[in-house]
Amino acid sequence: MHILVVNDDGPPNERVSPYVRPLVDELQSAGHLISVAIPAASRSWIGKAHLIEAELTAHLVHPDSFRPDGSWDSTYKPDPTTEDGAAGPQSDWVVIQNGTPASCTQLGLHNLFTDLPPIDLVISGPNHGRNASTIYNLSSGTVGGALEAVFCGKRGIAISFGSKDPQTDSVIAAAARLAVKLVGHLWRNWDERVELYNINIPMREDVEGQPVLYTRTLPYYWSRGCLYAETDRRKEEARRVLNGATNGVNGVHKETNGVNGVNGVNGVNGVNGVNGAHHGEPEAEAEAGTVSKQRHFKWSADLSDMKKRLQESEEGTDAHTVLNGSTSVTALRANFWHVPGLEGPIDLEL
């Protein structure tokens, strides 16, 4: 089977993307033809988004050239006397600058591997942590990559390894073996009502001996406050003014933001790394001491209530299953379906 692997955690990285290489290796060991297209930077919580104003750049990267921090050695050359080295470019992964999980799926299906047999299945993941409950599933870039596959006429499977804590190699290997076995089972026994599966695998040494259960998605809504916290940038802005406001030339603020110039967009900071130059902010161009007309916020989600709700979740849900040591498989369809019965004319006078 030809499988496209995408993810939302980016290149192999000991801290934020430790699971993708072990899964790819295990899939290849099972005899599958594997093509890999992944974003150049973490794109968690991005759902099925595309950065439509960004130009995407595909970098061919040999998997053995990745460093522990997710960067890679662009001068790396595999040993041609080995089986992997002799495979040439076919063994390369594709790392996509400005990529998202959904755009990696698009390019992987339609542009990057046209010299290979048609892709049968898209696997998105493994995510670094659980994707259980409606909030996680609708926000997840991992699930988003599998959703995009469905809209391209392919089957999709989202896989999440259920812990962000450091894991031993043996625990990761066990999760990867189970994932590959489960993928094979689902492929052979695919229910035609299903468009994608969402899998959550707990990280434990004996995971292969634990139950694997079909589950339903836990409904959940934010129970408190905003996901962002306001920051006080006044001192920082005053300091920037005194130091000449911007780091670039003529008010252009350049920011490579990563290794090999691939984490930002074209190495120049536009809107959160999307194309173009980031000109000096009005605040920075004003004189120190003026009243700011800007407010600044950073991601600061309080997940304590959510974690408590997940711990108390009902038996049979994805969250309850994975938190109690079993593997969760949730069968999904790729839609926001309408509420039945609300049809026909609307009387605005009521």
Describe each region flagged by the PLM.
Residues 2-3, 12-13, 17-118:
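A cross-family phosphate/adenosyl-ligand binding-site feature
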Residues 35-37, 95, 123, 155-159, ...:
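Hydrophobic/aromatic beta-strand patches that form the interior of the parallel beta-sheet core
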Residues 131-140:
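Glycine/threonine-rich flexible loop motifs
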Residues 178-182:
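Glycine- and Gly-Pro-enriched alpha-helical subdomains that act as flexible
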